[in-house]
């Protein structure tokens, strides 16, 4: 499946950044990235990575899985091709945005039943990081909109932790996972750094 494979990619990227050891760069470029391309689905547009290798046919496409890969590509943007792929994944991710519930990104392209913090919080982070790299204000504007939607719809006002998702009927799944709140903390800090709006810092 794509999810554990992308975790291996994240780990290798982190090791390369932390140590500067070129063996990790070699592993990424010679093994991990070629393997990752086995998941690329260019038949359905916008193109993205699907959950299972494409040679086995079409499978589910998850917005959150593609966010993490796009973030890793962002961290590898010393090559133009990596930035190009990160932007392509960003475009796919935001194809999952809809006006239902006032906005927000769905979790799965084939199961548009609910909108999850795990699809929206890291999309905010990705948007700010792409803005920093490209200086294209559309990324910052969409990051601010995504952050505001997530905070309005999925933040528990009693403890400021984040619920898991809200379905299209307006019912909230109130499970709370550390990675959801953690991504919103990071998003708030990044937005504060780019806008100077102290409300983002207070939120974080």
Each language-model region and where it sits:
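Glycan-recognition and catalytic cores of secretory/periplasmic carbohydrate-active enzymes
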Residues: 1-204
């Amino acid at each position: 499946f794509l999810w554990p494979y992308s975790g291996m990619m994240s780990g290798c990227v982190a090791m390369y950044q932390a140590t500067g050891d070129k063996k990790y760069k070699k592993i990424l470029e010679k093994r991990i990235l070629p393997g990752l391309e086995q998941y690329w689905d260019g038949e359905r547009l916008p193109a993205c990575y699907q959950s299972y290798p494409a040679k086995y046919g079409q499978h589910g496409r998850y917005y959150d899985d593609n966010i993490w890969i796009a973030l890793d590509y962002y961290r590898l943007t010393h090559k133009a091709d990596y930035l190009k792929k990160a932007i392509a994944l960003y475009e796919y991710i935001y194809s999952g945005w809809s006006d239902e519930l006032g906005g927000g990104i769905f979790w799965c392209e084939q199961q548009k039943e609910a909108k999850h913090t795990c699809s929206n919080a890291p999309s905010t982070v990705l948007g700010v990081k792409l803005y920093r790299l490209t200086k294209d204000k559309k990324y910052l504007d969409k990051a601010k909109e995504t952050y505001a939607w997530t905070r309005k719809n999925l933040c528990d006002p009693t403890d400021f932790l984040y619920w898991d998702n809200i379905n299209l009927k307006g019912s909230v799944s109130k499970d709370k996972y550390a990675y959801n709140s953690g991504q919103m903390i990071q998003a708030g800090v990044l937005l504060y750094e780019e806008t100077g709006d102290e409300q983002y810092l207070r939120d974080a």
